[in-house]
């Protein structure tokens, strides 16, 4: 069993009873693959598939002019290189993007030629705007901030049949409807009303009888009836009227007269119901026709037009009802045969026939006119416009597209075998939909479930971007078509025709402000992954919160293994925003698939197949926890399975597939909760959501009890640094790791060195700290894919969101009432929950009307202490500790000339001009903030001279880059000279430095005596060897030139002016690191939805302690467990205690330092790791590795209890016993204040507890005086506005109830909106006279004005 570099250092004991057949796939694959398919970068023009950008271009081009004399054709496109890398874009506030250029061809036809002849062709590359590029971690950098495009779950194109569940009509009758939804174009609805007449509507406009649409499609009334009805045939002869018998149609009917056989024997008596027996008898008797009375025919409906053969006169029309007069007419006209529609009340309704009666259009054109009037009311219908509109509705490629998915779903639903076809609708398609709808109304067939994941598909980034790009191109197309007519006469080139602005505007708008383009949640690595794996039903073309009903939000059986049933927000978005399940992926059509193991001949194989929700319902699928024997066959006679979205028990021989893993049904966040199977679903939901809010701690600590997904989550999130290639570590410091690559992994002619620059103290989107720490030391040998540096919230390559705390479940003086949390002061002293938050403060110097603003140190009225910290450029020094109100960047703004007061005149006389014509607009630290300045960045517009600070920042960056290049050059040189030495050793020479004699052999001593660069001057006798020496020399020189060019390019980039917004001359960004310690009011939570607020931090000596004197870290209320039903936290606590106990045991073994310590450790590890669950290959570890493992496990042996396959009670007891702890998990605690034992034993153990991003420091806020609202003159609200506390209606009631009239008066006047009163109070306080004179509150004046505006005169009279 191969272990990675970090796994070997700290093995996690897994209790999984079954091995995963399929490793967890790369978690960000959906985003990355979708965008890769959109760009199709790196593919040649001929290899590109018709998707993404390619599809957008080919769907719009070629563009023809109105006269057809010129056309613009698309050839290919290519993406350029981005100007700035990701980090530079973030610093400068730019978008990380690449220029897109399309090669187009302008073809001009010869007008004079009789047949189409090409006159000239011009080909050219045209700039089409910038396309944002995706970072390797699946996000986008837009205007300097990281954003994520969330995938959208929308209704798949195709045809859907449903009914109104009896809600529309008071009778509760089911009204059936069908809807054809295209990917792009008009929606077509068909619906029955309460009178069983079938209507259609386009784009939810006015409804019209469906026969109008059929007539517009070219059907006559006769052909309509022919398409939808079976016929009964009647003959008129001398015997009267005879009826051609179709026995099957008579079942269930009541005979209106005696039905006799050939021998006049009565088979069915009058008024009796005809049964299957009667039908068999009729068949046997060979009755084909029988005579019927006239009333049997009356009331039936004619199926076709009836024409008098002699005169050619129309006797009756199709769909006319037969009356006695009409029968006489038919007989008189010599009609000997006619057909009627076969209908009955049970399963052959006369719906189309009734609809045809309500329709008064006469022919195809009249029907089209009716549709035109419905679509464009008030416009005069001309023949061309009428025909064009009808064709454009559903039959034009430009206006209508079902898409490949829509066509596949459509054909599948209407029962066709082929799944491909055109994107537009055909007459047959529309008729097929109407037929199915009529069948549904007749009681045959099933309606569709719109919440089934086979009817909802995912639109990922690539597809959403493609739609926007196409929308931009459509705007371009209109402009190009206008200009094409001039192309010939004005001799224009393609770039004159195409204006790329609409395209870039559409793309920019989508990435910048679309509802699905969201500011990335970057609190910790898990929140990043979850955000990128999110699927939302909201957004353009999706649902809205208000309209979404309960059914859409509910968990559906098809969510199994596709969408997580647990992780979704609480509140208005519940069920509309979901997370992809752990193993889910989207297929080519956009439907979510989940993997299954194939079962062949009762044996579960390791062959994996992905099934979508549509395919899955056909198979019987066993769950992952089904018991298998050694051969992979099912042990039980009945196995719990799923079939047709129902849970059922099935015999093993019927099973066709089996789940891949027990964790298959949940998302990443839910799969990180150990013992999830013991938690109530509501609490599991809160647990999944709160893990995403955990703030990275200063020293991350791996969870003692995890699930085994921690490593996958950390690696896939991109927060840890992964080795791209194997090699040996050459150099390590806090900021970079240099690795000399193994020869077999280095490509020819390439530098065999990888340099990883680590991210140091960088601000995330949520102001948390991202910092990477190296895990390797010089000389370590690492393989490809190993974790070489930890990031935020990771510990040795594993996700570590919180800290392991010693927890006791007991009440403590009411301080843990209602979920409050009691914390040991030691936790704060040891900085266990201290986190660093980085605030970015920026200031810009603009060019104003009165002159440019200036960033300077020369500011009047600034205290010496403040000035001392600013450098000569007026910018604060890095490392300075600052508090609220301190100046960070000095800035002055020119001030307009104003009338000077005598005092100002005096100041001007003393200090000269400068003092009065500028005002101080320096960047100061906002209220309530303090910290340390950790970085400063200065951006200067092109053409404006840089100050010394800006220059020194550039110099530092260049020096760092030079250091990187020098390292790479050093390794290249070492590598080259090592090869050269091997080549020269013991070779015969013709001569060389230090008078080397011809014919002598080169010794190692001789080479050591020379400078390495002089080795190239040795002249070898062997020509081939000489050529190799020359080749090495050339490649070394080439590398040096290459590196010099790279340095120059970097220098050029840094020294060039920065792109800044218009009018901005200079911008300075200052980064503050703020240390936040744990304090009362901070919110904390476990992973099981158990959240609370810190109520008190108790001195160590007062905390309850164990018999060995160890005080507990946290005291939680035991009443928080039973009603919430999240028992997982108790099991975690027990197993966490075992983990710590085993760690201490290992520590004791290591401390004993006996000779046999390695042997003892190896034996103990086998006890821990190999008695149950997944076995580990302990024998494969070397003695040094065993010792290092022991060293790392002293704090605690990490356990993995995978979801739905976790540790059993027996296994937890066994681990507690192995650690020498009580198996019950309870122990006697002593009161820290009295030293007495508590009455009964208390559950104690270790639990992973998180500090959440709801910190009291961010919420606490106080105001003295501040801004007021303009209209009401009341203080603004909220911390951001530096607002006041609202004294609302209920608070007023409270004071009224107390009778505190003076307090109430000042609350409603001088402390709020009595403008004069509050100024007076301020003056009085200054004078030392503490009087209050309350006046009229401004809001009363507003009320008076409101009443006057209603036309009611209101005046105040003084008494």
UniProtKB/Swiss-Prot annotation:
Top enzyme category: transferase
The keyword Transcription appears for this protein: yes
Cross-referenced PROSITE patterns: RNA_POL_BETA
Keyword Transcription in record: yes
Domain of life per record: Bacteria
GO cellular component: DNA-directed RNA polymerase complex
GO molecular function per UniProt: DNA binding; DNA-directed RNA polymerase activity; ribonucleoside binding
UniProt KW keywords: DNA-directed RNA polymerase, Nucleotidyltransferase, Transcription, Transferase
Gene Ontology biological-process annotations: DNA-templated transcription
Catalytic activity: RNA(n) + a ribonucleoside 5'-triphosphate = RNA(n+1) + diphosphate
InterPro entries: DNA-dir_RNA_pol_bsu_ext_1_sf, DNA-dir_RNA_pol_bsu_external_1, DNA-dir_RNA_pol_su2, DNA-dir_RNAP_su2_dom, DNA-dir_RNAP_su2_hyb_sf, RNA_pol_bsu_bac, RNA_pol_bsu_CS, RNA_pol_bsu_protrusion
EC identifiers of the protein: 2.7.7.6
HAMAP family: RNApol_bact_RpoB
Listed NCBIfam families: PRK00405.1 (NF001616), rpoB (TIGR02013)
Oligomeric and partner information: The RNAP catalytic core consists of 2 alpha, 1 beta, 1 beta' and 1 omega subunit. When a sigma factor is associated with the core the holoenzyme is formed, which can initiate transcription.
Family: Belongs to the RNA polymerase beta chain family.
Function: DNA-dependent RNA polymerase catalyzes the transcription of DNA into RNA using the four ribonucleoside triphosphates as substrates.
Name by which UniProt lists this protein: DNA-directed RNA polymerase subunit beta
Species: Thiobacillus denitrificans (strain ATCC 25259 / T1)
């Amino acid at each position: 069993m191969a272990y990675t570099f970090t796994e070997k250092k700290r093995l996690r004991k897994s209790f999984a009873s079954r091995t995963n057949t399929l490793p967890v796939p790369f978690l960000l694959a959906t985003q990355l693959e979708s965008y890769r398919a959109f760009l199709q970068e790196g593919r040649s023009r001929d290899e590109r598939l018709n998707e993404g950008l390619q599809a957008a271009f080919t769907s719009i081009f070629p563009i023809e002019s109105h006269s057809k004399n010129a056309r613009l054709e698309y050839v290919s496109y290519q993406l350029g290189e981005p100007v700035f890398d990701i980090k530079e874009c973030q610093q400068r506030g730019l978008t990380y993007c690449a220029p897109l250029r399309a090669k187009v061809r302008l073809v001009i036809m010869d007008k004079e030629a009789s047949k189409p002849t090409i006159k000239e062709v011009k080909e050219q590359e045209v700039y089409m705007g910038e396309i944002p590029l995706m970072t390797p971690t699946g996000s986008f950098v837009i205007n300097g901030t990281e954003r994520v495009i969330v995938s959208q779950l929308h209704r798949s194109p195709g045809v859907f049949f449903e009914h109104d569940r009896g809600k529309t009509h008071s009778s509760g009758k089911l009204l059936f409807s069908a809807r054809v939804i295209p990917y792009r174009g008009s929606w077509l609805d068909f619906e029955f009303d309460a009178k069983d007449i079938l209507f259609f509507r386009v784009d939810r406009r006015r409804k019209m009888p469906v026969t109008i649409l059929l007539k517009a499609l070219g059907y006559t009334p006769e052909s309509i009836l022919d398409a939808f009805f079976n016929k009964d045939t009647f003959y008129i002869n001398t015997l009267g009227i005879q009826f051609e018998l179709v026995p099957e149609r008579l079942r269930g009917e009541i005979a209106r007269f005696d039905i006799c056989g050939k021998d006049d024997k009565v088979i069915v008596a009058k008024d009796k119901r005809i049964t299957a027996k009667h039908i068999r008898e009729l068949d046997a008797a060979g009755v084909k026709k029988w005579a019927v009375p006239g009333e049997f025919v009356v009331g039936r409906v004619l199926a076709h037009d009836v024409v008098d053969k002699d005169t050619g006169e129309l006797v009756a029309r199709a769909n006319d009802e037969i009356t006695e007069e009409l029968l006489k007419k038919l007989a008189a006209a010599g009609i000997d045969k006619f057909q009627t529609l076969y209908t009955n009340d049970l399963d052959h309704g006369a719906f189309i026939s009734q609809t045809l009666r309500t329709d008064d259009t006469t022919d195809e054109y009249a029907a089209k006119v009716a549709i035109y009037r419905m679509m464009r009311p008030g416009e005069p219908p001309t023949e061309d416009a009428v025909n064009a509109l009808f064709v454009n509705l559903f039959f034009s490629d430009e206006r209508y597209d079902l898409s490949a998915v829509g066509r596949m779903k459509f054909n599948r639903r209407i029962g066709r075998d082929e799944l491909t076809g055109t994107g537009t609708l055909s007459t047959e398609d529309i008729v097929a939909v109407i037929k199915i709808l009529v069948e549904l109304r007749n009681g045959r067939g099933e309606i569709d479930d719109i919440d089934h994941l086979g009817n909802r598909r995912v639109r990922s980034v690539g597809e959403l971007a493609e739609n926007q790009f196409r929308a931009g191109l459509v705007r371009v197309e209109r402009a190009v078509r206008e200009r094409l007519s001039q192309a010939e006469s004005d001799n224009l080139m393609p770039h004159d025709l195409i204006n790329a602005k609409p395209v870039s505007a559409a793309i920019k708008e989508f990435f910048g402000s679309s509802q699905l383009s969201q500011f990335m949640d970057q609190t910790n690595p898990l929140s990043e992954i979850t955000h990128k794996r999110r699927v939302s039903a909201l957004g353009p073309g999706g649902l809205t919160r208000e309209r979404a009903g309960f059914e859409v939000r509910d968990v559906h059986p098809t969510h199994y293994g596709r969408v997580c049933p647990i992780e979704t927000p609480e509140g208005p978005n519940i069920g509309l925003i979901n997370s992809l399940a752990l193993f889910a992926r989207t297929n080519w059509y956009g439907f979510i698939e989940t993997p299954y193991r194939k079962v062949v001949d009762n044996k579960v194989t390791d062959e994996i197949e992905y099934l979508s929700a549509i395919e899955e319902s056909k198979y019987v699928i066993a769950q992952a926890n089904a018991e298998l024997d050694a051969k992979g066959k099912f042990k039980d006679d009945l196995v719990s399975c799923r079939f047709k979205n129902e849970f059922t028990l099935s015999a093993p021989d019927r099973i066709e597939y089996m789940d891949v893993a027990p964790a298959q049904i949940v998302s990443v966040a839910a799969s990180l909760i150990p013992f999830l199977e013991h938690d109530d679903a509501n609490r599991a939901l809160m647990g999944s959501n709160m893990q995403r809010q955990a703030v990275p701690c200063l020293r991350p600590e791996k969870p003692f009890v995890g699930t085994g997904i921690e490593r996958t989550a950390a690696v896939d999130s991109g927060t840890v640094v992964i080795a791209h290639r194997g090699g040996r570590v050459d150099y390590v410091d806090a900021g970079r790791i240099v690795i000399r690559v193994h020869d077999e992994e280095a490509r020819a002619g390439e530098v065999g060195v990888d340099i990883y620059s680590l991210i140091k103290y960088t601000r995330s989107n949520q102001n948390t700290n991202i910092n990477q720490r190296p895990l390797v030391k010089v000389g370590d040998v690492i393989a490809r894919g190993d974790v070489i540096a930890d990031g935020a919230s990771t510990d040795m390559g594993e996700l570590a969101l919180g800290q392991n705390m010693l927890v006791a479940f007991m009440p403590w003086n009411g301080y843990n009432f209602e979920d409050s949390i009691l914390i040991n002061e030691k936790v704060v002293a040891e900085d266990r929950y201290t986190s660093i938050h980085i605030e970015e403060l920026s200031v810009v110097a603009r060019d104003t009307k009165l002159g440019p603003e200036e960033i300077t140190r020369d500011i009047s009225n600034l205290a010496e202490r403040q000035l001392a910290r600013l450098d000569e450029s007026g910018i604060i020094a890095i490392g300075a500790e600052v508090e609220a109100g301190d100046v960070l960047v000095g800035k002055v703004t020119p001030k307009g000339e104003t009338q000077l007061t005598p005092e100002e005149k005096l100041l001007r006389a003393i200090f000269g001009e400068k003092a009065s014509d500028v005002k101080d607009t320096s960047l100061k630290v906002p209220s309530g903030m303090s910290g340390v300045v950790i970085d400063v960045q200065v951006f200067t517009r092109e053409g404006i001279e840089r100050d010394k600070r800006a220059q020194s920042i550039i110099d530092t960056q260049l020096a760092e880059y030079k250091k990187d290049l020098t390292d790479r050059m050093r390794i290249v040189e070492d590598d080259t000279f090592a090869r050269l030495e091997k080549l020269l050793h013991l070779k015969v020479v013709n001569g060389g430095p230090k008078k080397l004699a011809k014919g002598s052999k080169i010794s190692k001593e001789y080479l050591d005596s020379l400078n390495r660069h002089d080795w190239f001057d040795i002249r070898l006798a062997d020509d081939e060897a000489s050529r190799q020496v020359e080749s090495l020399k050339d490649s070394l020189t080439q590398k040096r030139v290459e590196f010099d060019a790279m340095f120059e390019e970097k220098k050029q980039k840094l020294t060039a002016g920065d792109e800044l917004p218009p009018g901005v001359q200079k911008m300075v960004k200052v980064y503050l690191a703020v240390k936040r310690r744990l304090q009362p009011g901070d919110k904390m939570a476990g992973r099981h939805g158990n959240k609370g607020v810190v109520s008190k931090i108790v001195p160590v000596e007062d905390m309850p302690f164990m018999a060995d004197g160890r005080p507990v870290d946290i005291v939680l209320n035991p009443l928080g467990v039973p009603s919430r039903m999240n028992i997982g936290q108790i099991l975690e606590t027990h197993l966490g205690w075992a983990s710590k106990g085993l760690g201490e045991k290992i520590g004791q073994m290591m401390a004993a330092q006996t000779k046999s310590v390695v042997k003892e450790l190896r034996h103990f590890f086998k006890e821990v790791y190999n008695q149950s669950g997944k076995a580990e290959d302990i024998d494969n570890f070397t003695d040094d590795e065993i010792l290092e493992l022991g060293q790392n496990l002293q704090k605690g042996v990490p356990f993995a209890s995978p979801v739905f396959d976790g540790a059993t009670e027996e296994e937890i007891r066994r681990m507690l016993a192995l650690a020498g702890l009580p198996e019950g998990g309870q122990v006697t605690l002593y009161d820290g204040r009295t030293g007495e034992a508590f009455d009964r034993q208390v559950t104690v153990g270790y639990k992973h507890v998180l500090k959440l991003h709801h910190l009291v420091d961010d919420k606490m806020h106080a105001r003295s005086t501040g801004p007021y609202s303009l209209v009401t003159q009341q203080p603004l609200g909220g911390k951001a506005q530096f607002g006041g506390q609202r004294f609302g209606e209920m608070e007023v009631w409270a004071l009224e109830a107390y009778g505190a009239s003076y307090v109430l008066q000042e609350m409603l006047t001088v402390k709020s909106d009595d403008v004069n009163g509050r100024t007076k109070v301020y003056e009085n306080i200054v004078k030392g006279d503490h009087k209050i004179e309350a006046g009229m509150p401004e809001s009363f004046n507003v009320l008076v004005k409101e009443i006057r505006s209603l036309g009611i005169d209101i005046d105040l009279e003084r008494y």
